[in-house]
């Protein structure tokens, strides 16, 4: 369910995606991911290509590199290395797809912008803002969204 909803939101927002070629989006920000154990991990990408990884206060130092020709981010997490391709990028969220997969996402939220880490709500709000959508509650309980022509 979340994967389908996430894919739908990413498809609607892809024309508004930034790129990691502008490294100021990535560097020196508190990027946060909720891992498979439902624990929060924080990643801080440094200008010198080092990567600070923190989980439960335990820190490891990894490395990262960006390959603009492939729009891919290589992340060396000390225990493993992963290659991720850009799916959707903005100042609040990095949605990356693990290379060679269709639906295996690596999602990082900028905790300064999304303090509650609710990425679906953030993306839905971005979708409404970028696409100028206005929502209406219908009497049958459904919602109707239409594009607003007012700016």
Each language-model region and where it sits:
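Lipid interaction determinants
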Residues: 1-61, 68-151
């Amino acid at each position: 369910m979340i994967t389908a909803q996430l894919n739908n939101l990413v498809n609607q927002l892809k024309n508004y995606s930034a790129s990691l070629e502008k490294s100021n989006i990535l560097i020196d920000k508190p990027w946060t991911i909720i891992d498979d154990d439902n624990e929060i991990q924080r990643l801080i990408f440094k200008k010198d290509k080092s990567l600070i990884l923190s989980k439960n206060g335990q820190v490891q130092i990894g490395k990262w590199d960006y390959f603009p020709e492939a729009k891919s981010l290589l992340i060396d997490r000390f225990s493993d290395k992963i290659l991720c391709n850009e799916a959707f990028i903005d100042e609040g969220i990095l949605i990356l797809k693990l290379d060679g997969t269709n639906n295996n996402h690596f999602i990082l939220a900028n905790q300064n912008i999304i303090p509650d880490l609710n990425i679906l709500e953030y993306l839905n709000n971005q979708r409404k803002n970028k696409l100028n959508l206005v929502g209406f509650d219908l009497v049958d309980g459904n919602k109707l969204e239409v594009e607003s022509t007012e700016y």
